[in-house]
Design a protein with these regions (language model features):
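Sec-dependent N-terminal signal peptides
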Residues: 1-36
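Intrinsically disordered, low-complexity regions enriched in Ser/Pro/Gly/Gln/His and often acidic
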Residues: 12, 94, 126, 176-177, ...
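C-terminal, well-folded lobe of enzymatic/effector domains
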Residues: 16, 162-260
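Amphipathic alpha-helical interaction segments
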Residues: 27-29, 109, 147, 178, ...
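Intrinsically disordered, low-complexity regions enriched for glutamine and histidine
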Residues: 29, 37-40, 51, 134-137, ...
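N-terminal module-boundary/linker segments of secreted carbohydrate-active enzymes
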Residues: 33-37, 42-112
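Betabetaalpha-Me/HNH-type nuclease active-site subdomain
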Residues: 76-173
């Protein structure tokens, strides 16, 4: 009897040992993935992403223009009031795309005028605008010009105001009805048959560029543009206080901007 009891006890101990083994194994399986996942989360390195410049959506700007009739008040440009004037004899040798850093431009406007912004900058620098780089203009250039007066200007004279619905289409890239009207009269008319063609070319060139979403020094801006825009890699660019200049030949290939 004692022998039977000992044997039975031994069997019970073995069963308990086996049960304990499988219980511990199951717990280990259920718990082990968690540290691995956590480790993966900790060691994963996020890839750098290109952040495009911030801007109000084009459709929002167009809707705003339609709802606000004051956007299109007194936007015509009078040639006789222009301080530089007309030059119909200068040749068109190449083109310069002038881009403006809107936050910098608006800071200067506010420093100069405070809350009494001139009508030409009210739309661009309004309190609800979040624009980055915008198109100042696309300028036909004379390669032999010695001053700004030597470039083509007002080649078709003092033109009438453009239709409001046409201007509204391009406020997202050139945020000002007077800006658009003036650039067409002063510059676009010297190389394009219509304002529609002129603005469409501006939009095409602007859309082909990647632009930084922050203010950079001149050299930093040039490096950034060449790094993110292969077509600019070997080109000489131009810049002023808040503007960037990119030049194109008459076949719309990027070329060096003149240093003078």
């Amino acid at each position: 009897m004692k022998k039977f009891t000992s044997t039975l006890s031994l069997i019970v101990l073995v069963v308990l040992a086996i049960w304990q083994y499988f219980t511990d194994s199951t717990k280990t399986k259920n718990q082990s993935p968690s540290p691995v996942i956590e480790q993966t989360k900790q060691t994963k390195v996020s890839e750098p992403k290109f952040e495009p410049q911030f801007e109000t959506k084009r459709t929002d700007i167009e809707k705003s223009a339609v709802k606000n009739p004051n956007v299109f008040t007194n936007y015509d440009v009078i040639m006789r009031d222009d301080p530089i004037g007309q030059n119909v004899k200068a040749p068109v040798d190449y083109y310069m795309l002038a881009l403006s850093w809107s936050p910098g431009f608006c800071d200067i406007q506010r420093e100069k005028y405070g809350n009494q912004l001139p009508s030409s900058s009210q739309y661009q620098c309004g309190s609800n605008r979040t624009l980055g780089w915008v198109v100042h203009g696309l300028w036909p250039q004379n390669a032999n010009a010695l001053s700004v007066t030597d470039h083509p200007r007002f080649c078709k004279g003092d033109l009438p105001a453009l239709p409001k619905d046409l201007l509204a289409q391009y406020l997202a890239i050139s945020p000002g009805e007077q800006l658009l009207q003036g650039e067409w009269e002063k510059h676009g008319s010297c190389a394009f048959d219509s304002a529609q063609q002129y603005f469409a070319k501006e939009q095409e060139l602007f859309s082909s560029l990647k632009l930084p979403n922050q203010n950079l020094s001149r050299n930093e801006l040039f490096r950034w543009m060449k790094q993110h825009n292969p077509q600019l890699k070997n080109a000489y660019l131009g810049a002023s206080r808040n503007e960037l200049f990119i030049c194109y030949d008459k076949k719309w290939q990027v070329m060096n901007c003149q240093s003078k």
